[in-house]
Amino acid sequence: MLVGLIVERASGQPYARFLTERILAPLGLAATSVGGPPPEPAARGYRDGAPVTPFDLAAMAGTGDIWSTAADLARFTAALHAGNLITNESLHAMLTPHAPIEDDDEDLTTTGYGYGMFTGTFAGHAAYYHPGDNPGYLSFAGWIPDLSASLVILANDESVVIPDLLRKLLPAALGES
């Protein structure tokens, strides 16, 4: 919420409008929205096999109130890592691990956390990623720099184990299957 408030104060605009006008529209992310419950026709979210009633996140601007598609998230991730959204200096700070994390998973390591991005490796490839969740939904948006590839997973069931899905999908995504 702090980032949302900072954006609103610095820009003089509501957070949702600022993101839409300055990031979403210029990148052509037409299937992405900010604030409110998931837009129609979003898949229904589930927890323990039961539907979850969506709620309006607009009052908590900057805290998971962005709804998107895999294609839009992949486009956003590529634009971010190409330096099209922030300065190279800011991108470097974002991707530099400021908080080390120890992880013993061989296929999917996490080595640290930068400013909003986890750092690590996927199947031996350096990677940066950010997971997300809302009641009934999970998300994962990753970037593999040496392949210039985005990897996005969206789930409408809280029981999905993203690392397990990544292990299954990585070989195909990396062209190794």
Where are these regions (language model features)?
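A generic alpha-helix propensity feature with a strong bias for hydrophobic helices
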Residues: 29, 41-44, 153, 166, ...
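A short local loop/turn or secondary-structure capping micro-motif enriched for an aromatic residue
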Residues: 61, 136-138, 159-162
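Short, well-ordered beta-strand elements
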Residues: 3, 129-130, 138-157
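Short, surface-exposed loop or secondary-structure junction motifs
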Residues: 1-135
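Short, low-complexity, polar/charged sequence segments that are solvent-exposed and flexible
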Residues: 87, 135-136, 147-149, 170-175
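Short, gly/Ser/Thr-rich active-site loops of penicillin-recognizing serine hydrolases
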Residues: 99-102, 156-177
